Amino acid sequence: GSGVSNGGTEMIQLSHIRERQRYWAQDNLRRRFLEK
């Protein structure tokens, strides 16, 4: 994470990143399906 961070904020940031990646993956699949 960022320079000033403890374990708690690191875990929170990691979970946010995973949620964002999951959202983008689903969005990409949806777009690919709609384009066909």
UniProtKB/Swiss-Prot annotation:
Residues in coiled coil: none
Top-rank taxon: Eukaryota
Tissue specificity comment: Supra, subesophageal ganglia and segmental ganglia of the ventral nerve cord and brain.
Gene Ontology process terms (BP): neuropeptide signaling pathway
Keyword annotations from UniProtKB, A to Z: Amidation, Hormone, Neuropeptide
Keyword Kinase: no
PTM-bearing positions, type Lysine amide: K36
Single GO MF annotation: hormone activity
Task performed by this protein: May be involved in leech reproduction.
The protein's name in its UniProt record: Egg-laying-like hormone
Annotated organism of origin: Theromyzon tessulatum
Lineage, highest ranks first: Eukaryota, Metazoa, Spiralia, Lophotrochozoa, Annelida
